[in-house]
C-alpha cells in the first residue's frame, strides 16, 4: 500500500519493544563476509535483543527490503527498532499530501509506466537507443490522490537499457531484494 500523510502519531510512537527483530538481512550479510575478527565480532551481535531507539531512523521505511514510503516499509522499520519514521512529503494534482522521496520518481518506484496512468507522465517512456539510455519521468503532481492510490509500489529501480516500459520496471540494485515486493 502506498503511504499518505496523516496527523496521526507514527507507528513507532508509543509501541513497546515486544516483537522487534532485525530480520534476516544482517545475519545474511555477515555470513557473506570473509572469516576474520570483524566477522566473529559481528556474529556475536546476532544474539542481541533489538530495542527501539530514536537513534535508529526508518528513512523512507525499510527500503532495502520493501518499496520505500509504503505502509509495509514503515511497519518493517518500526519492527526492526526504528524509533523515528521519516516521511518526505510531496503533493498530488488535487493538492493532497503523500509520502514520497521526490516529486518526479513514480517511473522508478511504481508501476505507472505499465498502468492506465502512463499517459500522465511528463516524459513518456522512451526506449534505449544505441548509447542513449531509456528514459521516462512521471510526477506525483500530475495525478490525483485517487489515481495515486491505484499505483502499485515497487523497489526503486529502472533498467536503463530497456526497450519496453515493462523491461524498464526491472533493474533492481544488487543490495535490494524483491522478495517482499508484491
Feature locations, PLM:
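Bacterial N-terminal signal peptides
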Residues: 1-6
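Phosphate-group recognition and catalysis centered on beta-loop-alpha active-site segments
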Residues: 9-182
